């Protein structure tokens, strides 16, 4: 991408998001992470309640249920632990959605941070290049004006 175009895009993104656009992403990612931890803890507890006493249930202790909720939220799903009751499966759906959403927000915040850093770097390069080009243009213009002034003086001197 040409530097001028990337600089324009960087300015456009900064204009749209403002200075606090990146902070907004980090706050959303932080809130999603806190919510995920709450869902993991509550989901583990609810899974134990839902699964306790069911035939073939494996999620009958809190530590096992907590491990299962982390597996489920991260979409690893080893398959070693799984709910067997309807209520346990509904809890699993909530844990899955919370995990997928939270990891998506954190990933988006990280990507925004990396892209923002690169855009800022390119924007600085573009501003520096534009300033250097403007200074060169000004010097060239002044030199041309001086030459034209000299030529006009020479023509005036020759006419006299």
Swiss-Prot record:
Q: Which ranges of this chain reside in the Extracellular compartment per its record?
A: 51-61, 81-87
State the annotated membrane topology for this chain: Multi-pass membrane protein
Report, per the Swiss-Prot or TrEMBL entry, which residue stretches are intramembrane: 62-72, 73-80
Cytoplasmic-facing ranges = 1-27, 112-160
Which superkingdom? Bacteria
Q: Which GO terms describe its molecular function?
A: identical protein binding; voltage-gated potassium channel activity
Under the heading Pfam families, the entry gives: Ion_trans_2
Q: Which InterPro entries match?
A: K_chnl_dom (IPR013099), VG_K_chnl (IPR028325)
Q: Which UniProt keywords apply?
A: Cell membrane, Ion channel, Ion transport, Ligand-gated ion channel, Membrane, Transmembrane, Transmembrane helix, Transport
Q: Which positions, given as ranges, span the membrane? A: 28-50, 88-111
The annotated consequence of gene deletion is:
Cells grow slower and to lower myceliar densities.
Subunit relationships: Homotetramer.
The entry's free-text remark on domains says: The cytoplasmic C-terminus is involved in the gating mechanism.
What's the family? Belongs to the potassium channel family.
Q: Which PANTHER family does this entry report, sorted A to Z? A: POTASSIUM VOLTAGE-GATED CHANNEL PROTEIN SHAB (PTHR11537:SF254), VOLTAGE-GATED POTASSIUM CHANNEL (PTHR11537)
In its UniProt entry, what is this protein called? pH-gated potassium channel KcsA
Q: Which organism is it from?
A: Streptomyces lividans
